[in-house]
């Protein structure tokens, strides 16, 4: 998986493959969405989707950390998102709600992931799976939230 000279795939020195991370995020979205609809325990949801994911190359460890993180911190994530929403969390479309929870988890708990990556991934995922204009809603919420949640990072870049 590494290129000559020790560089990871796609030229990343940190060994993180952005394609595999994107796939992990998409699978995590599906798992969080299923959990929102059917409920269940984090380990059950992870086990179900990890088994299905075995047929698709993705960052399984990242998938598991996202799903576990969102499910175990749902209340805190919803509280953090609330000031940036124009309606109650449960009133947000289920796909957009899952996208927002995943992105909120990454923005708040995964400081190693640049906020622009989190927002761009969330927008692309909302475009792919959400309602026609869901991605614009997701973008607006996350842009406002990132200014507060990632002050140092967003302030330094002029966002």
UniProtKB/Swiss-Prot annotation:
The name this protein carries in UniProt is: Transcription antitermination protein NusB
Entry's Pfam families?
Answer: NusB
For the keyword Transcription, the answer is yes
Family to which this protein belongs: Belongs to the NusB family.
| Keyword entries, A-Z | RNA-binding, Transcription, Transcription antitermination, Transcription regulation
Its annotated function is as follows: Involved in transcription antitermination. Required for transcription of ribosomal RNA (rRNA) genes. Binds specifically to the boxA antiterminator sequence of the ribosomal RNA (rrn) operons.
> Matching SUPFAM superfamilies, A to Z?
NusB-like
Q: Which organism is it from?
A: Xanthomonas campestris pv. campestris (strain ATCC 33913 / DSM 3586 / NCPPB 528 / LMG 568 / P 25)
Name of the gene: nusB
Q: Which InterPro entries match?
A: NusB-like_sf (IPR035926), NusB_fam (IPR011605), NusB_RsmB_TIM44 (IPR006027)
């Amino acid at each position: 998986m590494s290129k000559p000279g020790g560089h990871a795939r796609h030229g990343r020195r940190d060994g993180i493959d952005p394609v595999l991370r994107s796939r992990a995020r998409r699978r995590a979205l599906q798992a969080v969405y299923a959990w929102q609809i059917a409920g269940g325990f984090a380990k059950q949801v992870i086990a179900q989707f990890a088994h299905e994911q075995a047929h698709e190359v993705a960052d399984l460890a990242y998938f598991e950390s996202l799903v576990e993180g969102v499910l175990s911190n749902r209340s805190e994530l919803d509280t953090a998102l609330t000031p940036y929403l124009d309606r109650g969390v449960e009133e947000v479309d289920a796909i957009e709600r899952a996208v927002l929870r995943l992105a909120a988890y990454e923005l708040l708990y995964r400081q190693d992931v640049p906020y622009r990556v989190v927002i761009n991934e969330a927008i692309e995922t909302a475009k792919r799976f959400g309602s026609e204009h869901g991605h614009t809603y997701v973008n607006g919420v996350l842009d406002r939230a990132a200014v507060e949640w990632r002050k140092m990072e967003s302030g330094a870049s002029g966002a």
